[in-house]
UniProtKB/Swiss-Prot annotation:
Leading EC class: hydrolase
Organism classification: Bacteria, Pseudomonadati, Pseudomonadota, Alphaproteobacteria, Hyphomicrobiales
Family to which the UniProt record says this protein belongs: Belongs to the peptidase C58 family.
Keywords, sorted A to Z: Hydrolase, Plasmid, Protease, Thiol protease
Swiss-Prot/TrEMBL GO biological process terms: proteolysis
Extent of Polar residues compositional bias: 1-15
Native species: Sinorhizobium fredii (strain NBRC 101917 / NGR234)
Transmembrane annotation, as ranges: none
Stated name of the protein: Putative cysteine protease YopT-like y4zC
Amino acid sequence: MHSPISGSFTSSTQVHDPIHPANSDGFRETLANVELRTKSPSAECPDKMGCCASKPQASDPNNPSTSSPARPSTSLFRYRTAELAQANADGICVGLTAEWLRNLNSHPSIRMEALVPGSQRHASATVRQKEYENLKVHLRRQGAGPSEADFAAQNTMLQKAGLAPSGKEKVYKVGEPNFPRMLTKITADGSNHLLSLYFAEGGAHTVATSAMDGNTTLFDPNFGEFTVQSDQIDDLFRSLANRYSNPNRQHLTTVTTQKMT
């Protein structure tokens, strides 16, 4: 267990059985666990968690590590407390988020330094991303649906990384009235969450949050860490959604959350 660091949107709940790490019989066991789930979010969520919706580029005046030929669209970067540049250029957001969650006890600047390209943790994130993607392909071949295979592969990788995903995922739709409930959950002191962002254009992206002492930090592998007082998380999320909308032209439609226990 890892310690936490020192517009409205209804939810429909997806409850998943815990996934166990793969061994010689692990793929069959994992697939069996997946088949026990009563409802899949696949009708709502594209099967692209490993394909990040946005990769930072270089000319955005709000952020030297991101680019846009258009006007600055959001105040997102005024919330940033630690920058991460170019770490996600190859679309390894799931692996990078796993490594960030494993390193929460470190200082923010150390966490970011540990994830820069060429570092040991960045290399580890690349390996974890590949493990996740390979297992997802295997589970699809075994008959699992896109969403089931994605969730099982993700959680197997997280467990192999020494993390403890709850095995229960909740789905929240942008523009519906229950999104504040999600914000309340991810800002509960002492909690860590894995979040998947799904976009109307078909892309998806993985981020994470950690809450402690009335503050919540959001880690986005494309940009770094953003920290706000927990009662300001709505503003941060709105700014994040705006940043992906303009200049990246990715419109957030759905957020799924899973608590890391």
